[in-house]
Design a protein with these regions (language model features):
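Acidic, metal-coordinating catalytic cores used for nucleic-acid/nucleotide bond scission
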Residues: 267-276, 294-297, 427-429
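Short, flexible loop/turn motifs enriched in small residues
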Residues: 9-12, 214-221, 229, 377-379, ...
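Secondary-structure transition/capping motifs at alpha-helix termini
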Residues: 23, 142-150, 168, 184-185, ...
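An anionic, glycine-rich sequence signature occurring as long contiguous blocks
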Residues: 218, 235-238, 284-398, 466-517
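Dynamic "connector" segments at or just before major functional cores
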Residues: 1-192, 196-201, 224-237, 242, ...
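Short, basic/hydrophobic alpha-helical segments
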Residues: 180, 246-263, 275
Length: 517
Protein backbone atom coordinates (compact mmCIF):
# COMPACT_ATOMS: atom_id res chain seq x y z
CA UNK A 1 0.00 0.00 0.00
CA UNK A 2 1.48 3.33 -1.05
CA UNK A 3 2.27 6.08 1.46
CA UNK A 4 2.33 9.70 0.38
CA UNK A 5 4.54 12.23 2.17
CA UNK A 6 4.32 16.00 2.21
CA UNK A 7 5.94 18.85 4.12
CA UNK A 8 3.89 21.45 5.95
CA UNK A 9 5.37 24.24 8.10
CA UNK A 10 8.70 22.46 8.12
CA UNK A 11 7.30 19.12 9.31
CA UNK A 12 6.77 15.97 7.27
CA UNK A 13 3.34 14.30 7.29
CA UNK A 14 2.17 11.00 5.82
CA UNK A 15 -1.05 9.45 4.61
CA UNK A 16 -2.30 6.46 2.68
CA UNK A 17 -3.95 8.07 -0.38
CA UNK A 18 -6.68 5.49 -0.84
CA UNK A 19 -8.50 5.09 -4.14
CA UNK A 20 -10.71 7.36 -6.22
CA UNK A 21 -14.24 6.58 -7.34
CA UNK A 22 -17.14 8.45 -8.92
CA UNK A 23 -20.31 9.23 -7.04
CA UNK A 24 -23.01 10.94 -9.12
CA UNK A 25 -20.39 12.37 -11.38
CA UNK A 26 -18.15 13.57 -8.57
CA UNK A 27 -14.73 12.13 -7.84
CA UNK A 28 -14.44 10.95 -4.24
CA UNK A 29 -11.82 9.17 -2.16
CA UNK A 30 -12.12 6.05 -0.04
CA UNK A 31 -9.62 4.24 2.14
CA UNK A 32 -7.66 7.38 2.98
CA UNK A 33 -5.65 6.96 6.20
CA UNK A 34 -4.04 9.99 7.78
CA UNK A 35 -0.95 8.68 9.55
CA UNK A 36 0.13 12.00 11.03
CA UNK A 37 3.62 13.35 11.50
CA UNK A 38 6.61 11.29 10.41
CA UNK A 39 8.90 10.22 13.23
CA UNK A 40 11.05 7.67 11.40
CA UNK A 41 10.40 7.37 7.68
CA UNK A 42 12.63 4.35 7.15
CA UNK A 43 10.92 2.25 9.84
CA UNK A 44 7.43 3.64 9.20
CA UNK A 45 7.01 5.24 12.63
CA UNK A 46 4.36 7.95 12.85
CA UNK A 47 2.56 10.02 15.45
CA UNK A 48 -0.94 11.40 15.72
CA UNK A 49 -3.30 12.38 18.52
CA UNK A 50 -5.44 9.26 18.24
CA UNK A 51 -2.68 6.62 18.46
CA UNK A 52 0.31 8.46 19.87
CA UNK A 53 3.55 7.04 18.41
CA UNK A 54 2.92 3.88 16.40
CA UNK A 55 4.15 1.77 13.51
CA UNK A 56 2.33 1.12 10.25
CA UNK A 57 3.03 -1.68 7.79
CA UNK A 58 2.19 -0.42 4.27
CA UNK A 59 2.26 -3.96 2.86
CA UNK A 60 -0.42 -5.36 5.18
CA UNK A 61 -2.14 -2.18 6.34
CA UNK A 62 -1.65 -3.24 9.97
CA UNK A 63 -1.04 -0.76 12.79
CA UNK A 64 1.35 -1.76 15.55
CA UNK A 65 3.14 -0.44 18.60
CA UNK A 66 6.34 1.45 18.06
CA UNK A 67 9.20 -0.54 19.52
CA UNK A 68 9.70 0.30 23.20
CA UNK A 69 13.34 1.09 22.51
CA UNK A 70 12.31 3.91 20.18
CA UNK A 71 13.43 7.26 21.55
CA UNK A 72 13.40 9.50 18.45
CA UNK A 73 12.43 13.07 19.24
CA UNK A 74 9.08 14.47 18.18
CA UNK A 75 9.85 18.03 17.22
CA UNK A 76 7.49 20.80 18.23
CA UNK A 77 5.20 21.96 15.44
CA UNK A 78 5.59 25.55 16.63
CA UNK A 79 1.98 26.07 17.62
CA UNK A 80 2.62 25.58 21.33
CA UNK A 81 5.01 27.94 23.06
CA UNK A 82 7.57 26.41 25.36
CA UNK A 83 7.12 27.39 29.00
CA UNK A 84 9.99 29.41 30.40
CA UNK A 85 8.86 29.42 34.06
CA UNK A 86 8.79 25.93 35.58
CA UNK A 87 8.38 24.23 38.96
CA UNK A 88 11.95 23.43 39.92
CA UNK A 89 12.70 22.43 43.50
CA UNK A 90 10.71 19.20 43.79
CA UNK A 91 12.02 17.47 40.67
CA UNK A 92 15.58 18.76 41.14
CA UNK A 93 15.53 17.45 44.71
CA UNK A 94 14.21 14.00 43.74
CA UNK A 95 16.65 13.59 40.85
CA UNK A 96 19.58 14.48 43.11
CA UNK A 97 18.27 12.29 45.95
CA UNK A 98 17.81 9.19 43.78
CA UNK A 99 21.36 9.56 42.50
CA UNK A 100 22.83 10.24 45.95
CA UNK A 101 21.42 7.02 47.46
CA UNK A 102 22.44 4.95 44.44
CA UNK A 103 18.91 4.06 43.43
CA UNK A 104 19.54 5.21 39.86
CA UNK A 105 21.54 1.99 39.43
CA UNK A 106 18.36 0.05 40.24
CA UNK A 107 16.38 2.03 37.66
CA UNK A 108 19.10 1.45 35.07
CA UNK A 109 18.62 -2.33 35.33
CA UNK A 110 15.07 -2.09 34.01
CA UNK A 111 15.13 -3.08 30.34
CA UNK A 112 12.88 -0.23 29.17
CA UNK A 113 15.24 1.74 26.93
CA UNK A 114 13.70 5.21 27.18
CA UNK A 115 15.07 5.95 30.62
CA UNK A 116 13.76 9.52 30.42
CA UNK A 117 10.19 8.19 30.35
CA UNK A 118 10.98 5.88 33.28
CA UNK A 119 12.51 8.61 35.43
CA UNK A 120 9.79 11.12 34.60
CA UNK A 121 7.08 8.61 35.55
CA UNK A 122 8.85 7.79 38.82
CA UNK A 123 8.76 11.49 39.68
CA UNK A 124 5.10 11.74 38.64
CA UNK A 125 4.20 8.86 40.95
CA UNK A 126 6.07 10.57 43.78
CA UNK A 127 4.72 14.07 43.26
CA UNK A 128 1.18 13.66 41.93
CA UNK A 129 -1.81 11.55 42.91
CA UNK A 130 -3.67 12.28 39.68
CA UNK A 131 -4.45 9.80 36.92
CA UNK A 132 -1.70 9.08 34.41
CA UNK A 133 -3.71 10.92 31.75
CA UNK A 134 -2.50 14.15 33.36
CA UNK A 135 1.19 13.23 33.41
CA UNK A 136 1.98 15.23 30.28
CA UNK A 137 0.41 18.39 31.73
CA UNK A 138 2.55 18.04 34.86
CA UNK A 139 5.65 17.29 32.78
CA UNK A 140 5.31 20.38 30.59
CA UNK A 141 5.20 22.67 33.62
CA UNK A 142 7.99 21.05 35.60
CA UNK A 143 11.79 21.04 35.49
CA UNK A 144 11.45 17.31 34.82
CA UNK A 145 10.90 18.26 31.16
CA UNK A 146 14.46 19.65 31.14
CA UNK A 147 15.95 16.80 33.16
CA UNK A 148 14.34 14.14 30.97
CA UNK A 149 13.79 15.79 27.56
CA UNK A 150 13.16 12.52 25.67
CA UNK A 151 10.33 11.36 27.95
CA UNK A 152 7.13 10.53 26.10
CA UNK A 153 4.16 10.93 28.44
CA UNK A 154 1.28 10.74 26.00
CA UNK A 155 -1.56 8.59 27.35
CA UNK A 156 -1.08 5.72 24.90
CA UNK A 157 2.68 5.67 25.35
CA UNK A 158 2.29 5.49 29.15
CA UNK A 159 0.07 2.41 28.71
CA UNK A 160 2.72 0.81 26.50
CA UNK A 161 5.37 1.75 29.05
CA UNK A 162 3.48 0.15 31.97
CA UNK A 163 2.89 -3.04 29.98
CA UNK A 164 6.59 -3.24 29.12
CA UNK A 165 7.58 -2.57 32.73
CA UNK A 166 5.20 -5.30 33.90
CA UNK A 167 6.61 -8.10 31.77
CA UNK A 168 8.02 -10.99 33.84
CA UNK A 169 11.61 -10.36 32.75
CA UNK A 170 11.32 -6.68 33.77
CA UNK A 171 9.78 -7.35 37.18
CA UNK A 172 12.36 -10.05 37.91
CA UNK A 173 15.23 -7.73 36.92
CA UNK A 174 13.81 -5.00 39.14
CA UNK A 175 13.38 -7.23 42.20
CA UNK A 176 16.93 -8.58 41.76
CA UNK A 177 18.42 -5.09 41.65
CA UNK A 178 16.18 -3.67 44.37
CA UNK A 179 16.87 -6.48 46.87
CA UNK A 180 20.59 -6.12 46.17
CA UNK A 181 20.32 -2.36 46.84
CA UNK A 182 18.50 -2.92 50.15
CA UNK A 183 21.03 -5.57 51.19
CA UNK A 184 23.88 -3.13 50.52
CA UNK A 185 22.30 -0.74 53.03
CA UNK A 186 21.22 -3.25 55.67
CA UNK A 187 21.39 -7.05 55.67
CA UNK A 188 18.89 -7.49 58.52
CA UNK A 189 17.33 -10.96 57.97
CA UNK A 190 14.14 -10.12 59.90
CA UNK A 191 11.18 -9.46 57.60
CA UNK A 192 7.54 -8.49 57.97
CA UNK A 193 4.85 -10.12 55.83
CA UNK A 194 1.33 -8.93 55.19
CA UNK A 195 -1.15 -8.51 52.37
CA UNK A 196 -3.51 -5.78 51.25
CA UNK A 197 -6.42 -5.71 48.85
CA UNK A 198 -6.38 -3.59 45.70
CA UNK A 199 -10.03 -3.08 44.67
CA UNK A 200 -10.47 -3.46 40.92
CA UNK A 201 -13.67 -3.70 38.88
CA UNK A 202 -11.86 -4.40 35.59
CA UNK A 203 -12.21 -8.01 34.49
CA UNK A 204 -8.99 -9.99 34.11
CA UNK A 205 -7.86 -13.23 35.78
CA UNK A 206 -6.22 -11.60 38.80
CA UNK A 207 -9.45 -9.88 39.84
CA UNK A 208 -11.69 -12.04 42.02
CA UNK A 209 -14.21 -11.75 44.83
CA UNK A 210 -12.45 -11.58 48.19
CA UNK A 211 -13.78 -12.18 51.69
CA UNK A 212 -11.02 -10.77 53.89
CA UNK A 213 -11.86 -10.38 57.56
CA UNK A 214 -15.54 -10.35 56.64
CA UNK A 215 -15.20 -7.61 54.01
CA UNK A 216 -16.50 -8.61 50.56
CA UNK A 217 -14.95 -6.93 47.50
CA UNK A 218 -13.65 -7.53 44.00
CA UNK A 219 -9.94 -7.11 44.25
CA UNK A 220 -6.40 -8.15 43.52
CA UNK A 221 -4.40 -9.29 46.56
CA UNK A 222 -0.83 -8.02 47.04
CA UNK A 223 1.45 -9.80 49.52
CA UNK A 224 4.51 -7.78 50.50
CA UNK A 225 7.74 -8.40 52.39
CA UNK A 226 9.26 -5.44 54.26
CA UNK A 227 12.64 -5.38 55.97
CA UNK A 228 12.13 -4.83 59.71
CA UNK A 229 15.11 -2.58 60.50
CA UNK A 230 14.76 -0.17 57.55
CA UNK A 231 11.08 -0.36 56.61
CA UNK A 232 12.07 -0.77 52.95
CA UNK A 233 9.89 -3.05 50.83
CA UNK A 234 11.73 -6.09 49.50
CA UNK A 235 9.29 -7.51 46.97
CA UNK A 236 5.63 -8.19 46.36
CA UNK A 237 3.54 -10.97 44.88
CA UNK A 238 0.13 -10.64 43.24
CA UNK A 239 -2.62 -13.24 43.61
CA UNK A 240 -6.33 -13.24 42.76
CA UNK A 241 -8.54 -11.79 45.46
CA UNK A 242 -9.98 -15.20 46.35
CA UNK A 243 -6.57 -16.68 47.28
CA UNK A 244 -6.32 -16.77 51.08
CA UNK A 245 -3.24 -15.48 52.89
CA UNK A 246 -2.26 -18.80 54.44
CA UNK A 247 -1.36 -20.28 51.03
CA UNK A 248 1.13 -17.52 50.11
CA UNK A 249 3.75 -17.74 52.88
CA UNK A 250 6.18 -20.27 51.40
CA UNK A 251 6.07 -18.91 47.85
CA UNK A 252 6.61 -15.34 49.00
CA UNK A 253 9.62 -16.26 51.14
CA UNK A 254 10.96 -18.41 48.31
CA UNK A 255 10.98 -15.35 46.02
CA UNK A 256 13.28 -13.68 48.54
CA UNK A 257 15.54 -16.73 48.90
CA UNK A 258 15.89 -16.92 45.10
CA UNK A 259 17.55 -13.50 45.30
CA UNK A 260 20.19 -14.67 47.78
CA UNK A 261 18.71 -12.74 50.69
CA UNK A 262 18.17 -14.77 53.81
CA UNK A 263 15.31 -14.40 56.25
CA UNK A 264 15.71 -15.99 59.66
CA UNK A 265 12.84 -14.20 61.39
CA UNK A 266 9.39 -13.34 60.06
CA UNK A 267 6.53 -11.46 61.71
CA UNK A 268 3.11 -12.37 60.31
CA UNK A 269 -0.55 -11.66 60.91
CA UNK A 270 -2.96 -14.36 62.10
CA UNK A 271 -4.10 -15.20 58.57
CA UNK A 272 -0.77 -16.90 57.81
CA UNK A 273 -0.85 -19.41 60.69
CA UNK A 274 -1.37 -23.03 59.60
CA UNK A 275 0.34 -26.25 60.65
CA UNK A 276 1.77 -26.63 57.13
CA UNK A 277 3.31 -23.13 57.19
CA UNK A 278 4.69 -23.73 60.69
CA UNK A 279 6.41 -26.91 59.46
CA UNK A 280 7.94 -25.05 56.50
CA UNK A 281 9.31 -22.31 58.76
CA UNK A 282 10.84 -24.76 61.23
CA UNK A 283 12.35 -26.78 58.37
CA UNK A 284 14.07 -23.65 57.01
CA UNK A 285 15.10 -22.51 60.52
CA UNK A 286 13.07 -19.33 60.20
CA UNK A 287 11.86 -18.04 63.57
CA UNK A 288 8.52 -16.29 63.69
CA UNK A 289 5.96 -14.30 65.64
CA UNK A 290 2.30 -14.44 64.70
CA UNK A 291 -1.06 -13.81 66.27
CA UNK A 292 -3.16 -16.92 66.87
CA UNK A 293 -6.84 -16.97 65.99
CA UNK A 294 -9.38 -18.22 68.53
CA UNK A 295 -10.57 -20.84 66.01
CA UNK A 296 -7.61 -23.11 66.84
CA UNK A 297 -7.91 -25.82 69.49
CA UNK A 298 -4.61 -24.85 71.09
CA UNK A 299 -5.92 -21.31 71.65
CA UNK A 300 -8.96 -22.53 73.57
CA UNK A 301 -6.93 -25.07 75.54
CA UNK A 302 -4.50 -22.42 76.75
CA UNK A 303 -7.30 -19.96 77.55
CA UNK A 304 -9.17 -22.61 79.52
CA UNK A 305 -6.09 -23.56 81.54
CA UNK A 306 -4.39 -20.22 82.09
CA UNK A 307 -6.99 -17.44 81.82
CA UNK A 308 -8.08 -17.86 85.48
CA UNK A 309 -4.55 -16.94 86.66
CA UNK A 310 -3.82 -14.33 83.96
CA UNK A 311 -4.97 -11.12 85.67
CA UNK A 312 -2.47 -11.02 88.47
CA UNK A 313 -0.06 -8.28 89.49
CA UNK A 314 3.05 -10.16 88.35
CA UNK A 315 1.61 -10.45 84.80
CA UNK A 316 0.82 -6.75 84.30
CA UNK A 317 3.09 -4.97 81.78
CA UNK A 318 3.00 -1.57 80.11
CA UNK A 319 3.29 -1.11 76.34
CA UNK A 320 3.36 2.56 75.37
CA UNK A 321 0.11 3.96 76.82
CA UNK A 322 -1.54 0.54 77.19
CA UNK A 323 -1.62 -1.81 80.17
CA UNK A 324 -1.78 -5.49 79.35
CA UNK A 325 -1.71 -8.70 81.38
CA UNK A 326 0.57 -11.23 79.64
CA UNK A 327 1.46 -14.78 80.57
CA UNK A 328 3.99 -16.90 78.67
CA UNK A 329 3.08 -20.57 78.24
CA UNK A 330 5.24 -23.25 76.62
CA UNK A 331 3.23 -25.18 74.03
CA UNK A 332 3.49 -27.62 71.11
CA UNK A 333 2.56 -26.53 67.59
CA UNK A 334 2.66 -27.89 64.04
CA UNK A 335 2.26 -31.44 62.80
CA UNK A 336 5.48 -32.46 64.55
CA UNK A 337 4.59 -30.67 67.79
CA UNK A 338 7.53 -28.28 67.88
CA UNK A 339 8.22 -26.46 71.12
CA UNK A 340 6.97 -22.88 70.94
CA UNK A 341 5.72 -20.16 73.26
CA UNK A 342 2.21 -18.81 73.52
CA UNK A 343 1.65 -15.38 75.04
CA UNK A 344 -1.86 -15.14 76.44
CA UNK A 345 -2.82 -11.51 76.89
CA UNK A 346 -5.62 -9.36 78.24
CA UNK A 347 -5.73 -5.75 77.01
CA UNK A 348 -7.39 -3.68 79.75
CA UNK A 349 -8.59 -0.83 77.50
CA UNK A 350 -9.73 -3.11 74.72
CA UNK A 351 -11.51 -5.43 77.15
CA UNK A 352 -13.35 -2.51 78.71
CA UNK A 353 -14.33 -1.12 75.30
CA UNK A 354 -15.57 -4.48 73.97
CA UNK A 355 -17.53 -5.14 77.16
CA UNK A 356 -19.14 -1.70 77.00
CA UNK A 357 -20.23 -2.25 73.39
CA UNK A 358 -21.59 -5.72 74.22
CA UNK A 359 -23.62 -4.36 77.14
CA UNK A 360 -24.99 -1.57 74.96
CA UNK A 361 -26.14 -4.09 72.33
CA UNK A 362 -27.69 -6.26 75.03
CA UNK A 363 -29.59 -3.27 76.43
CA UNK A 364 -31.09 -2.76 72.97
CA UNK A 365 -32.14 -6.44 72.89
CA UNK A 366 -29.75 -7.12 70.01
CA UNK A 367 -28.02 -10.10 71.65
CA UNK A 368 -28.94 -13.05 73.84
CA UNK A 369 -27.79 -13.57 77.42
CA UNK A 370 -25.67 -16.55 76.35
CA UNK A 371 -23.95 -14.54 73.61
CA UNK A 372 -23.42 -11.65 76.02
CA UNK A 373 -21.77 -13.93 78.57
CA UNK A 374 -19.45 -15.41 75.92
CA UNK A 375 -18.48 -11.94 74.67
CA UNK A 376 -17.76 -10.68 78.19
CA UNK A 377 -15.63 -13.76 78.89
CA UNK A 378 -13.46 -13.22 75.79
CA UNK A 379 -13.34 -9.42 75.73
CA UNK A 380 -9.79 -8.13 75.55
CA UNK A 381 -8.19 -11.57 75.21
CA UNK A 382 -5.57 -12.25 72.53
CA UNK A 383 -2.76 -14.71 71.91
CA UNK A 384 0.60 -14.38 70.20
CA UNK A 385 2.71 -17.42 69.29
CA UNK A 386 6.47 -17.38 68.72
CA UNK A 387 9.23 -19.89 68.18
CA UNK A 388 11.39 -17.72 70.48
CA UNK A 389 11.06 -17.28 74.27
CA UNK A 390 10.56 -13.52 74.64
CA UNK A 391 10.10 -11.99 78.08
CA UNK A 392 6.51 -11.00 78.83
CA UNK A 393 7.31 -7.29 78.54
CA UNK A 394 9.18 -7.79 75.25
CA UNK A 395 6.68 -9.69 73.11
CA UNK A 396 4.42 -6.73 72.28
CA UNK A 397 7.26 -4.42 71.11
CA UNK A 398 8.56 -7.30 68.98
CA UNK A 399 5.16 -8.17 67.48
CA UNK A 400 4.07 -4.61 66.81
CA UNK A 401 7.08 -3.85 64.66
CA UNK A 402 4.69 -5.27 62.05
CA UNK A 403 3.07 -1.84 62.14
CA UNK A 404 5.92 -0.88 59.83
CA UNK A 405 4.31 -2.85 57.03
CA UNK A 406 0.95 -1.23 57.73
CA UNK A 407 2.69 2.14 57.53
CA UNK A 408 4.24 1.01 54.25
CA UNK A 409 0.79 0.21 52.86
CA UNK A 410 -0.40 3.63 54.04
CA UNK A 411 2.54 5.27 52.25
CA UNK A 412 1.92 3.21 49.12
CA UNK A 413 -1.79 3.98 48.95
CA UNK A 414 -1.57 7.57 50.15
CA UNK A 415 1.65 8.94 48.66
CA UNK A 416 2.80 6.50 46.00
CA UNK A 417 -0.28 6.05 43.75
CA UNK A 418 -0.82 2.37 44.63
CA UNK A 419 -4.59 2.83 44.48
CA UNK A 420 -6.93 3.27 42.78
CA UNK A 421 -6.02 0.84 40.02
CA UNK A 422 -6.54 2.30 36.54
CA UNK A 423 -5.17 -0.50 34.36
CA UNK A 424 -6.73 -2.95 31.92
CA UNK A 425 -4.18 -5.76 31.66
CA UNK A 426 -2.04 -7.88 33.97
CA UNK A 427 1.20 -6.51 32.49
CA UNK A 428 0.06 -2.92 33.05
CA UNK A 429 -0.95 -3.85 36.61
CA UNK A 430 2.53 -5.18 37.38
CA UNK A 431 4.10 -2.13 35.74
CA UNK A 432 1.94 0.17 37.86
CA UNK A 433 2.85 -1.73 41.04
CA UNK A 434 6.57 -1.60 40.20
CA UNK A 435 6.35 2.19 39.84
CA UNK A 436 4.40 2.39 43.10
CA UNK A 437 7.05 0.32 44.88
CA UNK A 438 9.83 2.56 43.52
CA UNK A 439 7.95 5.64 44.70
CA UNK A 440 7.20 4.04 48.09
CA UNK A 441 10.88 3.14 48.56
CA UNK A 442 11.90 6.76 48.03
CA UNK A 443 9.08 7.92 50.31
CA UNK A 444 10.22 5.51 53.05
CA UNK A 445 13.77 6.85 52.73
CA UNK A 446 12.51 10.43 53.00
CA UNK A 447 10.37 9.53 56.01
CA UNK A 448 13.28 7.82 57.75
CA UNK A 449 15.52 10.85 57.26
CA UNK A 450 12.99 13.59 58.07
CA UNK A 451 11.04 12.00 60.90
CA UNK A 452 12.68 14.30 63.40
CA UNK A 453 11.94 17.42 61.33
CA UNK A 454 8.76 17.08 59.27
CA UNK A 455 6.38 14.14 59.33
CA UNK A 456 4.28 15.39 56.42
CA UNK A 457 5.89 14.37 53.14
CA UNK A 458 3.54 16.60 51.16
CA UNK A 459 4.89 19.61 53.02
CA UNK A 460 8.37 18.79 51.74
CA UNK A 461 7.37 18.60 48.10
CA UNK A 462 5.01 21.59 48.22
CA UNK A 463 7.72 23.70 49.83
CA UNK A 464 10.25 22.60 47.23
CA UNK A 465 7.77 23.14 44.39
CA UNK A 466 7.55 26.80 45.36
CA UNK A 467 11.12 27.18 44.11
CA UNK A 468 10.76 28.04 40.42
CA UNK A 469 13.24 28.25 37.58
CA UNK A 470 13.48 30.37 34.45
CA UNK A 471 14.62 28.70 31.23
CA UNK A 472 16.90 30.69 28.93
CA UNK A 473 18.58 29.54 25.74
CA UNK A 474 21.77 28.36 27.41
CA UNK A 475 21.07 28.74 31.13
CA UNK A 476 18.43 27.81 33.68
CA UNK A 477 18.28 30.10 36.69
CA UNK A 478 16.39 29.21 39.85
CA UNK A 479 14.86 31.35 42.56
CA UNK A 480 16.15 31.42 46.11
CA UNK A 481 14.85 28.41 48.05
CA UNK A 482 12.74 29.17 51.10
CA UNK A 483 14.07 28.48 54.59
CA UNK A 484 12.28 25.13 54.88
CA UNK A 485 13.48 24.10 51.42
CA UNK A 486 17.05 24.85 52.48
CA UNK A 487 16.54 22.66 55.54
CA UNK A 488 15.43 19.77 53.32
CA UNK A 489 18.40 20.22 51.01
CA UNK A 490 20.74 20.26 54.02
CA UNK A 491 19.24 17.13 55.64
CA UNK A 492 19.83 15.12 52.46
CA UNK A 493 23.20 16.67 51.65
CA UNK A 494 21.94 18.21 48.41
CA UNK A 495 23.36 21.53 47.23
CA UNK A 496 21.16 23.75 45.09
CA UNK A 497 23.10 25.36 42.20
CA UNK A 498 23.13 29.06 41.42
CA UNK A 499 22.17 28.21 37.86
CA UNK A 500 22.46 25.35 35.37
CA UNK A 501 24.31 25.55 32.05
CA UNK A 502 22.78 23.85 29.01
CA UNK A 503 25.52 22.75 26.63
CA UNK A 504 25.30 20.07 23.91
CA UNK A 505 22.38 18.39 25.62
CA UNK A 506 24.18 18.31 28.98
CA UNK A 507 23.05 20.01 32.19
CA UNK A 508 26.00 21.45 34.12
CA UNK A 509 25.25 22.87 37.61
CA UNK A 510 27.15 26.03 38.55
CA UNK A 511 27.40 26.87 42.25
CA UNK A 512 29.39 30.12 42.23
CA UNK A 513 29.08 33.41 40.42
CA UNK A 514 31.21 33.58 37.27
CA UNK A 515 32.17 36.84 35.63
CA UNK A 516 31.37 36.91 31.88
CA UNK A 517 34.40 36.86 29.63
Amino acid sequence: MEINYQFKNGNEYAKVPGTSYRDNGKVRKKGVIYLGRVIDKEHHIFCNRERGIFSYDPDTGVFGKADETYISDLKSDGRKKQKILLDFGDSFFLDALIKSIGYDTVLNTLPYRNKDTLRAMVQYYLLCNSANDHAKIWYEGNFASILYPKANLTSQRITDFLESLGRPESTSAYFDAHVSWVRSICDDPAVLMDSTGLPNSIHFPLTAVSNHNGKISREVRMTTLVQRDTGYPLLFRITPGNIVDLSTVTRTLNELFLRDMSADFVIMDAGYYTNDNIEELYACEVDFITRLSSKYTIYNQIVKEHEPTLRRKENLVQYKDRYVYIKRVECKIGHKEHTAYAYLGYDVDRGSDESHKALKRAAQNQTSTADLHKTLENSGLFMIVSSLPFEEDGILPAYYTRQLIEQYFDISKGSSKLTPLRVHSEEALYGHLILSMIAATINVHIQNRTNCIYSNKEEIFMTLRNQKCTVYKSKITNAEPQKKANEFYEVFGIKCPLYIEQSNGQLIPVYHLEKPV
